[in-house]
């Protein structure tokens, strides 16, 4: 969320950002937020003064009595102080809830390079890599390839677990594991520490990491424990250092999270209804970085380049798009998507999301860095995240781009050492 001090100093900048996002409903929130903030600070001052008076009035009463003076007015004042303090505290609590409600939902400040647009049709292409292959035979979609070769069983998974699940079998299990290890090896060479996070996260932490209004509908909730199965390892990694202070020398901290991801709402998109692209459960390697604010825009490009390197080495054609103001969501200040070429649909589809969240998560989570020149000075860190590989989507891209007329699939050269040097699935 935004720091209330930033809101006080920059209300016009926030209003302009909301207009770029076409989020007109929240414009009125800014005025009310500032009014509530002023009242809240007034109440703090008044309540502190009442507490000081409560502590000192006993002395005044005793002094009056010793002097033979009438202390009835002081006694009456003292009797009323607890009630006045309680009233102020109750009002402060209500105002605090309202302020937090606003701050948790007003989106991050956009970077100046984010294109203005209404929706995903106005995202801006940044670059393309590779040339889509020309096929001389009728293409199969990845789900058909997997079923025909007994690499996956969608029908039995539907019986056991419902739509959107799958059994991976044989070669696709090995391909999934190869993609995980391949991407981890690339990141480890670049100084990223592998992390296997908890697969559940409690509600308090989730509320600090993301906007639950947007995200809760896609998550599996464990009711008895007020916890959730994680939708991405980004979330537990972001909450990992909540309420802690980094030393500047320890940043940037680069993490590579490996986990299954669980998502309830998957939607449908033409040929996705049976297959690996939109599913309730998949494996993902996620890049996550805590860094000093001065470094975050350089690191944002680093994360994108890391993800691009993975798809380049897999020899999958892709494009990079800069996500526009109407499609970027609440948390990110800037976001790239990498979209891989899917020949069966004859279009690019998202396989990587790469975001700089600046201080938005860190303010909620109270994660700061101490200034190396001034021990008492601290500021909020920046957090960044990017997909390295979502294996189900990468497998779809490999199956469709590398399929052969006989139904076999060429294994990317970089994955062969992880698959007993086999050339074909």
Swiss-Prot record:
A biological process from GO: selenocysteine biosynthetic process
SUPFAM superfamilies the UniProt entry points to: Class II aaRS and biotin synthetases, tRNA-binding arm
The record's note on its domains: Consists of two distinct domains, a catalytic core and a N-terminal extension that is involved in tRNA binding.
PANTHER family reported for this sequence: SERYL-TRNA SYNTHETASE
EC number(s) from the headed UniProt entry: 6.1.1.11
Record text on subunit structure and interactions: Homodimer. The tRNA molecule binds across the dimer.
Keywords of the record: Aminoacyl-tRNA synthetase, ATP-binding, Cytoplasm, Ligase, Nucleotide-binding, Protein biosynthesis
Pathway noted in the entry: Aminoacyl-tRNA biosynthesis; selenocysteinyl-tRNA(Sec) biosynthesis; L-seryl-tRNA(Sec) from L-serine and tRNA(Sec): step 1/1
A GO cellular component entry from the record: cytoplasm
Molecular-function GO terms, alphabetical: ATP binding; serine-tRNA ligase activity
HAMAP family: Ser_tRNA_synth_type1
Name listed for the protein in its UniProt record: Serine--tRNA ligase
Subcellular localization(s) per the UniProt record: Cytoplasm
């Amino acid at each position: 969320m935004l720091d209330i001090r930033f809101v006080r100093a920059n209300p016009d900048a926030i209003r302009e950002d909301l207009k770029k996002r076409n989020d007109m409903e929240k414009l009125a929130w800014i005025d009310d937020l500032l009014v509530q903030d002023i009242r809240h600070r007034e109440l703090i001052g008044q309540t502190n003064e009442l507490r000081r008076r409560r502590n000192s009035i006993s002395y005044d009463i005793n002094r009056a009595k010793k002097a033979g003076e009438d202390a009835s007015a002081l006694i009456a004042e003292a009797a009323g102080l607890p009630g006045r303090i309680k009233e102020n505290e109750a009002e402060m609590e209500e105002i605090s809830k309202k302020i937090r409600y606003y701050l948790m939902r007003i989106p991050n400040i956009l970077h100046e390079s984010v294109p203005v647009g209404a929706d995903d049709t106005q995202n801006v292409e940044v670059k393309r890599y590779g040339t889509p292959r020309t096929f001389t035979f009728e293409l199969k979609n990845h789900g058909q390839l997997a079923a025909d070769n007994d690499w996956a069983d969608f029908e039995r998974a539907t019986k056991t677990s419902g739509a959107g699940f799958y059994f991976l079998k044989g070669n696709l299990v090995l391909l999934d594991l190869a993609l995980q290890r391949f991407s981890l090896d690339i990141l480890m060479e670049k100084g990223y520490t592998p992390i296997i996070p908890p697969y559940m996260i409690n509600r308090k932490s989730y509320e600090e990491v993301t906007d639950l209004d947007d995200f809760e509908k896609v998550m599996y909730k464990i009711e008895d424990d007020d916890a959730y199965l994680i939708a991405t390892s980004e979330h537990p990694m972001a909450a990992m250092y909540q309420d802690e202070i980094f030393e500047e020398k320890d940043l940037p901290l680069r993490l590579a999270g490996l986990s299954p991801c669980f998502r309830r709402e998957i939607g449908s998109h033409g040929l996705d209804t049976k297959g690996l692209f939109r599913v309730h459960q998949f494996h993902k390697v996620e890049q996550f970085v805590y860094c000093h604010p001065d470094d975050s825009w350089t690191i944002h490009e680093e994360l994108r380049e890391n993800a691009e390197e993975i798809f380049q080495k897999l020899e999958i054609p892709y494009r990079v798009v800069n996500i526009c103001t109407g499609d970027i969501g609440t948390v990110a200040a800037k976001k790239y998507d990498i979209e891989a070429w899917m020949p069966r649909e004859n279009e690019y589809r998202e396989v990587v999301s790469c975001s700089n969240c600046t201080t938005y998560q860190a303010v909620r989570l109270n994660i700061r860095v101490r200034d190396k020149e001034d021990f008492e000075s601290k500021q909020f860190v920046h957090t960044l995240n990017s997909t390295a590989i979502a294996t189900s989507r990468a497998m779809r891209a490999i199956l469709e781009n590398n399929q052969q007329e006989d139904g076999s699939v060429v294994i990317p050269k970089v994955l062969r050492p992880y698959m007993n040097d086999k050339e074909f699935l």
